[in-house]
């Protein structure tokens, strides 16, 4: 087996449940300019799975069906996805123009990064961050009341 025969993926690939595979793929491509690994899409009666590339990151989207997957309504809420892009302001303008539900406008964070927050078409929260701006932890300008490190 050669390297070209192997699936290329990062060490961690999050999986997010959705109710409509095709609509979700279209939304990510149109609103966030992400790309599907088309050759890897799987479908089955009532469901499917697709792998989505966001820069060098990879995640998959799942729709429950007859494969024994967990029903989307039973998934615990509270997960936020973070993805890095080259230009937060440009990404924000595009997502907003495409009708994305914006939670917060682009802003500079105490860690040096620039971010905005947005909900996707099914209400999952995404934090879009600008690549190459995050400072080392010892250089963060912490807001009042926030401490660094493990409490003693």
Model-assigned labels for residue ranges:
Residues 122:
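C-terminal catalytic core of tyrosine-transesterase DNA break-rejoin enzymes
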Residues 1-15, 25-26, 31-86, 90-119, ...:
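Vicinal oxygen chelate
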């Amino acid at each position: 087996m050669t390297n070209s025969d192997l699936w290329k993926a990062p060490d961690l690939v999050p999986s997010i449940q959705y109710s409509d595979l095709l609509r979700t793929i279209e939304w990510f491509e149109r609103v966030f300019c992400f790309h599907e690994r088309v050759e890897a899409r799987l479908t089955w009666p009532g469901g499917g799975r697709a792998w989505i590339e966001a820069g060098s990151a990879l995640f998959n989207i799942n729709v429950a069906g007859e494969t024994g997957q967990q029903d989307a309504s039973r998934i615990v809420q509270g997960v936020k996805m973070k993805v890095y892009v080259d230009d937060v302001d440009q990404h924000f303008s595009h997502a907003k123009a495409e009708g994305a539900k914006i939670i917060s406008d682009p802003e500079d964070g105490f860690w040096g990064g620039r971010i905005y927050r947005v909900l996707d078409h099914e209400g999952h929260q995404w934090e879009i961050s600008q690549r190459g701006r995050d400072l080392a932890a010892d250089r963060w300008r912490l807001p009042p009341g926030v401490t660094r490190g493990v409490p003693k």
